[in-house]
Regions:
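Phosphate-binding/catalytic loops
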Residues: 95-161
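ATP-dependent NMP and nucleoside kinases share a basic, alpha-helical "lid"
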Residues: 76-103
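Short glycine-rich anion-binding loops that position phosphate/pyrophosphate groups of nucleotides
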Residues: 15, 89-92, 111
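Short glycine-/acidic-enriched loop or helix-start segments at secondary-structure transitions
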Residues: 19-21, 51, 92-97, 116
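Conserved active-site segments centered on acidic
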Residues: 2-75, 79
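Structural signal for conserved beta-strand scaffold positions within catalytic alpha/beta enzyme cores
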Residues: 9, 41, 86, 105-108
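Alpha-helix boundary/capping residues
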Residues: 61-62, 88, 159
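Conserved small-residue
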Residues: 14, 58, 84-85, 132
């Protein structure tokens, strides 16, 4: 068996968008073949806990994410990744950079954690889940193992729909 395709999903707080991205990559990657994809997430300024609306949204889609904690980008420094995906919103926050990945792409999304009213927060998290779900499905449909770095970057950026 070949080594799994390793993906790191980065944002600032690692409490919402990147956690949802990691969860989708882990669960849908496993559904397409055990060991095909390994995903982690981290943040440049990790929050104290995963946003409860992220956990709730994932649970509504059958993904149990209880007990996870945000990680710092420092926690994964030195690890090798085939693809790094930043999901922060360029307009409102600085996206972290992770050196040494084979390819890095940006899938910018507004931070759903900025919504404080419960109905608006649930709506924002659902929209984030839906956007990442479409992108992850499109990414996992690619022949990831056979793409060189330039083709991987181009293809992974193209699924940012």
């Amino acid at each position: 068996m070949t080594a799994p395709f390793r993906v790191l999903v980065l944002c600032t707080g690692n409490s919402a968008r990147s956690q949802i991205g990691e969860a989708l990559l882990q669960t849908r990657g496993a559904a397409r073949g055990a060991g095909r994809v390994t995903a982690l997430s981290a943040g440049s300024r990790p929050a104290p806990r995963v946003n409860p609306y992220a956990v709730e949204t994932l649970a509504a889609h059958g993904i149990q994410w209880d007990g996870r904690t945000p990680k710092s980008i420092d926690d994964v420094a030195g690890e090798a990744f085939d693809l790094v995906i930043t999901v922060c919103d360029n307009a409102h926050e600085a996206c972290p950079y992770f050196p040494g990945a084979r390819a890095q792409v940006h899938w910018g999304l507004p931070d759903p954690a900025e919504e404080t009213e419960p109905a608006a927060a649930r709506h924002a998290f659902a929209a984030t889940f839906d956007a990442l779900s479409r992108r992850v499905d499109a990414l996992l449909a690619l022949p990831l193992e056979s793409l060189d770095a330039a083709a991987l970057r181009t293809a992974a950026q193209a699924v940012h729909i």
